[in-house]
């Protein structure tokens, strides 16, 4: 009986030691760093952008009024496919995956330009053109943070959830499909 107990204790101790060492080995085998991906920097900018965003959210009426001002750009960062189905009249499409220094410099050379953004989660009752994302994955959030990261501070976001069929914002399909 004593021998069985010793063997059992030895096995348990060996298992516990191996389990405790596993996280250390995993840390040592971490993938190499990528200088083009900076999670800490992203989170810092995201927090700063979130504070900025608090005072840059617009009602439907204010969005409509400002969208008619000369020099204001309404930016739709959804896919071209969704943009072509339905978008705010006058909006310019720059898919989120295409937001780069070069494309922004081409489309918005002046970082002081007023930019109005909206996304899928601003419209309901048209899932084909505006498929709903999880609230924490809303394209407005990613777009706002990206523009802020690239130095654009005159960015305003459409705040409310609107019915695509009754909104005062004119929604149109692209004619160049």
What are these regions (language model features)?
Residues 73-78, 91-94:
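Short hydrophobic beta-strand that contains or immediately precedes a catalytic carboxylate
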Residues 68-69, 88:
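Flexible, glycine-rich surface segments
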Residues 65, 82-85:
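Short, solvent-exposed loop/turn elements at domain surfaces
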Residues 70-75, 111-114:
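Short coil/turn segments at beta-strand junctions that form active-site/ligand-binding loops
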Residues 2-6, 10, 19-54, 84-88, ...:
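Rhodanese-like catalytic fold shared by cysteine-dependent sulfurtransferases
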Residues 52-66:
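A short, well-structured juxtamembrane/interface segment
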Residues 62, 78, 142:
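Short Gly/charged-rich anion-binding patches and loops
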């Amino acid at each position: 009986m004593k021998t069985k107990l010793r063997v059992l204790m030895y096995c348990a101790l060996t298992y516990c030691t191996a389990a405790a060492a596993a996280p250390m080995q995993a840390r040592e085998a971490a993938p190499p760093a990528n200088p083009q991906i900076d999670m800490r920097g992203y989170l810092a900018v995201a927090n700063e952008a979130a504070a900025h965003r608090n005072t840059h959210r617009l009602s439907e009426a204010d969005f409509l009024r400002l969208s008619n001002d000369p020099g204001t750009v309404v930016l739709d960062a959804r896919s071209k496919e969704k943009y072509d189905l339905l978008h705010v009249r006058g909006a310019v499409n720059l898919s989120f995956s295409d937001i780069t220094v070069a494309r922004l410099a081409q489309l918005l050379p002046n970082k002081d330009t007023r930019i109005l953004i909206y996304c899928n989660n601003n419209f309901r009752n048209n899932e084909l053109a505006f498929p709903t994302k999880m609230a924490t994955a809303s394209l407005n959030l990613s777009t706002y943070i990206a523009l802020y990261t690239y130095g654009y501070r005159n960015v305003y976001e459409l705040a409310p959830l609107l019915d695509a069929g009754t909104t005062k914002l004119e929604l149109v399909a692209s004619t160049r499909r």
